[in-house]
């Protein structure tokens, strides 16, 4: 019997500012990558050698990003041997203690966890695990502001962690949306894992959606998505004079976000910091 040919992969690491990474992932989604890794101001794209095309693919990535004014440069290219990427990645994930009462845990370690509030997820490599510092900060703010029988929006729900937490904290209706079909599928899966029944999930773009009236909004989005849509958040909070919790914001964008929200009749309540990231809480006050 002939030996199986072992696959090789190329890992292309680009320097891309954090606030552009969601957009770059979307723009490059048609390429047959086996994995995408997001780090601070870096993204790595892994592709099988059969698609390498003598290195032309790296220049194609840069050309696409430059055409949309996303600043990017090639930092590193390396050849790596075939591995069980998903198994390696899963082994690296540990339950995350958000605070003394909230834990986010991958499903394969859920049986090890005892916590007043346990959020079980089946993390997906393609769009995030819900473990980012911005998610943790919003979780802590939700614990402050979600009231019994309140209504909430999870804008850009990703894996659905924030929507699930809102229900566990007592919200009776949560509207969660994302423009990514895989995020929607994963959110629905995680809703089922947590036995939630008060969450409505839809695939929608934040630029075209009409938001319902609610008591609060959790928007863990990048600056370029928050600023053009703060007016929508204001409209959704008109009746309740509710709270808007925003994250996905780098420290140097904090004041610009606050100023924009103030122009739409929000008042600033607080700002939290974790590393280079911030979470800003505002209240509608027209």
Show where each model-derived region lies.
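N-terminal auxiliary segments of SAM/dcSAM-dependent transferases
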Residues: 5-113
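Amphipathic, non-transmembrane alpha-helical secondary structure
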Residues: 26, 62, 136-139, 143, ...
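A structural alpha-helix within SAM-dependent methyltransferase catalytic domains
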Residues: 29, 164-167, 230, 234-235
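Conserved beta-strand segments of alpha/beta enzyme cores
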Residues: 34-35, 73-76, 103, 151, ...
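SAM-dependent Rossmann-like transferase core, predominantly class I methyltransferases
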Residues: 85-147
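Conserved SAM/SAH cofactor-binding pocket of Class I
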Residues: 125, 129-210
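S-adenosylmethionine
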Residues: 179-286
């Amino acid at each position: 019997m002939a030996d199986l040919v072992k696959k090789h992969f190329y890992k292309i690491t680009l320097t891309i500012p954090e606030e552009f990474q969601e957009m770059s992932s979307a723009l490059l989604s048609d390429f047959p990558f086996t994995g995408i890794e997001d780090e601070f101001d870096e993204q790595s794209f892994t592709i099988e050698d059969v698609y390498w095309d003598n290195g032309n693919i790296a220049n194609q990535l840069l050309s696409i990003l430059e055409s949309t004014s996303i600043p990017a440069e090639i930092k590193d290219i390396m050849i790596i041997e075939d591995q069980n990427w998903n198994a390696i990645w899963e082994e690296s994930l540990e339950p995350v203690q958000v605070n003394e009462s909230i834990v986010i845990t991958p499903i394969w370690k859920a049986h090890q966890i005892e916590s007043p509030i346990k959020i079980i997820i089946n993390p997906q490599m393609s769009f995030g695990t819900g473990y980012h510092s911005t998610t943790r900060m919003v979780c802590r703010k939700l614990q402050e502001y979600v009231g019994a029988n309140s209504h909430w929006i999870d804008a850009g729900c990703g894996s659905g962690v924030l929507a699930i937490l809102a229900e566990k904290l007592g919200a009776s209706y949560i509207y969660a949306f994302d423009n990514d079909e895989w995020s929607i599928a994963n959110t629905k899966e995680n809703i089922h894992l947590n036995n939630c029944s008060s969450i409505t999930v839809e695939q929608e773009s934040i630029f075209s959606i009409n938001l319902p009236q609610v008591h609060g909004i959790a928007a863990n989005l990048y600056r370029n998505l928050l600023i053009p849509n703060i007016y929508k958040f204001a409209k959704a909070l008109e009746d309740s004079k509710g709270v808007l919790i925003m994250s996905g914001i780098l420290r140097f964008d904090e004041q610009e976000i606050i100023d924009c929200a103030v122009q739409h009749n929000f008042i600033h309540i607080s700002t939290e910091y974790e590393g280079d990231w911030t979470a800003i809480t505002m209240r509608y006050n027209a």
